[in-house]
Structure formats: structure tokens, C-alpha cells
UniProtKB/Swiss-Prot annotation:
Subunit structure: Homodimer. Interacts with FtsZ.
One GO cellular component term noted in the UniProt record for this chain: cytoplasm
Organism taxonomic ancestry: Bacteria, Bacillati, Bacillota, Clostridia, Peptostreptococcales
Location(s) in or outside the cell: Cytoplasm
Source organism superkingdom: Bacteria
Organism: Clostridioides difficile (strain 630) (Peptoclostridium difficile)
UniProt keyword Ribonucleoprotein, yes or no: no
Keywords: Cell cycle, Cell division, Cytoplasm, Septation
Descriptive protein name: Cell division protein SepF
Function: Cell division protein that is part of the divisome complex and is recruited early to the Z-ring. Probably stimulates Z-ring formation, perhaps through the cross-linking of FtsZ protofilaments. Its function overlaps with FtsA.
Amino acid sequence: MSNGIISKFKNWIVDEEEDYIEDEYESGMDDIVQEEEMNSGFSTAKANKIVNLHTTSQMKVVIVEPKVYDEAATIADHLKQRRAVIVNLEGLTNSEVRKSIFNFMNGAVYVLDGSIQKVSKSIFILAPNNVDIDANMKKELESKAFFPWQNK
């Protein structure tokens, strides 16, 4: 009787090992099929969409009032760091320095594919290429109403 129990136990263990090997082989085939599907060249639009969630939280606007030409480089540095810059040139009395700083700012904006918008005679908004400047806002601010729906 003990031989019968031992042989049944052996058969039971051997059967489980055989099943395990077959399962392992079958799962290996599934992996190959999945790899072929992944490498088929077809992909969904959802898989191709890359979204950086940190860009909007890192947005900063810097206000600069340069007094000398050497401070123009700091404006370009802010643009390189993808920060929008409001430049106030009203404090400059020397028109040559004002013109030189303005030319430097225009060059920096051009090289970095940014944009520049005139706010007033001597105040400008410089934006890197990840920031859009809406020129319609100037028209809204020029109107007496604070909100567009107040113009009734």
C-alpha cells in the first residue's frame, strides 16, 4: 500500500512538472506573438502623444529695468532659460544705450525663435518660443471696460 501511495505521489508530482513545462513553453510563444505585434510598425495616436506636465508649472515672468548696456545679457539669459521677460527702458536717458539694448534684445529673440511685443513706447514683452503673446489683449486693455462683456 505504501508503494501505491508513493507511486501515486510521484505520478502526481511528475504530471505537475510536465504541465508546468508546457505552460512555460506556451507563455514563451505568447511573448513572441506580442513582440511581433509591437514591431509591426502600426501604432496608435495615443502612444505617440508625449506631454510634458512640468512646462506650465515652471512658467515665470521676469521684469527687468536695465540701466546700462551690460544688463542686456541678463535679458537674453532669462530667455534662454525659457522665461518671459518684461523690459522697461523708460529709466534710460541715453538714447544710444536704449537703442543698443533694444537691438540686442531683438537679436536674442530672433536667435531663440521667440517673440517680442511692444506694450508702450519703452516697455516690451519678450517671450521664448514656448510662450505665445496675444496681441488682442492690448485692444482689450485700451478699452475702458476691464472685461470684454462689460462693453454693452
